[in-house]
Amino acid sequence: MATASADLKIRRRLGRSELMVTPIGLGCWQFSKGRGLFGNYWTVLDDGEIQRILGLAINGGINWFDTAEAYGKGESEKALSKGLQNLGKSPGEVVIATKWNPVLRRSSSISGTIDTRLQNLAPFPIDLHQIHNPFSLSSVKSQVRAMAGLVHEKKIRYVGISNFSRGQMERARQELQKSGLPLVSNQVRYSLLDRRIEANGVLEAAKDLGISIIAYSPLAQGILTGKFHDDPQLIKSRSGF
């Protein structure tokens, strides 16, 4: 039987991109340092603990990391970059994904915020830039056009989405096709406790269209590991519960 470390030597193509990633990536919401609307959902981590987590991920074979503008108002991006540099990683050695926060904003803020994203993550480039959710004041068409513009300006490599329905995903893909670009991924909640994408058409459409599903909370934020059953006191340490 293959071991977990052996499995992480595998590289899978992300959608119809040239990005080759391990089957498991590391989500970096927990690097928010208590900032932002949901920054206190997690226990606040210091730089040393963040670097330890990143080191464990890298030593285990993980080669890609997912962060977002909304994670601590950019603190997660900064912490990720700092930690990777301290661990001796250079641009090109890891794959970086981040997300634009669309809530109550128009698509014009995609180009208006990209330089901050790049500054926070420097020297690492943005391999995948995602629309975090479908709650922008602008249409999907307008948002995707703005994202395509960033690709053509070489500020990002590829475009993804997150929390999009089947219809929204299909519209985003169609609009990107007009610019000659693929829609690489749709990042959605997916675990043994939440299998909605199997019934609502998202998973089926993604397979048909060559769009990778990036599953977030695949262990239901630790519930499926059994650790809360083994030690109920851990629940009290989670401010998000």
Regions found by a protein language model. Name each.
Residues 35-48, 100-108, 132-138:
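Active-site mouth loops of central-metabolism enzymes
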